[in-house]
């Protein structure tokens, strides 16, 4: 894959806080129009990496390009090409869902804020709830509205940092459907998660970040090939992503302690 095929390319990215190394030479490539899942435990450095790529934080070393723009030299162009949503929906609970969208569309100087709002409400299955105050929405509805708001202005790249944290199973599925819809429309999605099933359901490619380093990176099939199938009562059982995650993290820890 050439650099032109990548929406995001990262080489040797490093971040420290005092003596604590959060990111230790991260390399990764995210293909355009794909869903890339960055999988890791709490404290692995996932959110720090996303904040650096979104220009919220600066790296101590390394290089990155986002939508063809150099992160260090063209931060403004990077910001114009991305949208970032965090673990908690940044919506105004007093306003209706439609009013939230119209407000952001006006702030982003859209020609027809009302049309933008109605289109996004339909895209995320919120048309019937558009006239209701967001304070009455379920967690999944708020998160979908938050993602919809992040798409105003049609950014080609969306960062979703732990988008289903704290949601019930049905709400998580609703958000998953919204994320797949983004990729189907050509948007590049970089998703951070600690939920293995989320990465398994959504991602075209998965990287495992452990103690500040990418220790494996590939498709789900690639990762499963890292472990051999086992026989359970004469039935061959393929490894799950959970099996792979636990094995590679354990191997990495053993290698570092040896």
What are these regions (language model features)?
Residues 62-73, 77-78:
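Conserved ABC transporter NBD signature motif
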Residues 83, 102, 106-129:
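Conserved ABC ATPase "signature" region
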Residues 158-162:
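Catalytic Walker B motif of ABC-type/P-loop ATPase nucleotide-binding domains
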Residues 217-218:
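ABC ATPase "signature
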């Amino acid at each position: 894959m050439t650099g032109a095929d990548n929406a995001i390319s990262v080489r040797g990215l490093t971040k420290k806080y005092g003596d604590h190394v959060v990111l230790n030479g991260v390399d990764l490539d995210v293909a355009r129009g794909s869903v890339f899942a960055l999988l890791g435990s709490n404290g692995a450095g996932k959110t720090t990496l996303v904040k650096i790529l979104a220009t919220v934080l600066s790296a101590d070393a390394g290089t990155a390009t986002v939508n063809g723009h150099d992160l260090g030299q063209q931060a403004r162009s990077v910001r114009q090409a991305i949208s970032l949503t965090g673990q908690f929906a940044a919506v105004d609970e007093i306003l209706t869902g439609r009013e939230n969208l119209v407000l952001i569309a006006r702030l982003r100087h859209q020609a027809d804020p009302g049309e933008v709002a109605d289109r996004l409400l339909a895209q995320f299955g919120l048309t019937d709830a558009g006239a209701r105050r967001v304070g009455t929405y379920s967690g999944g509805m708020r998160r979908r509205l938050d993602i919809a708001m992040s798409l105003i202005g049609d950014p080609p790249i969306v960062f979703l940092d732990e988008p289903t944290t704290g949601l019930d199973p049905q709400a998580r599925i609703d958000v998953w459907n919204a994320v797949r819809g983004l990729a189907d429309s050509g948007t590049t999605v970089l998703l951070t998660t600690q939920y293995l099933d989320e990465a398994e359901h959504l991602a075209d490619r998965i990287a495992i970040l452990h103690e500040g380093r990418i220790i494996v990176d590939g498709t789900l099939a690639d990762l499963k090939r890292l472990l051999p199938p086992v026989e359970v009562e004469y039935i061959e059982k393929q490894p799950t992503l959970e099996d792979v995650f636990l094995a590679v993290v354990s191997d990495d820890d053993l290698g570092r302690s040896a």
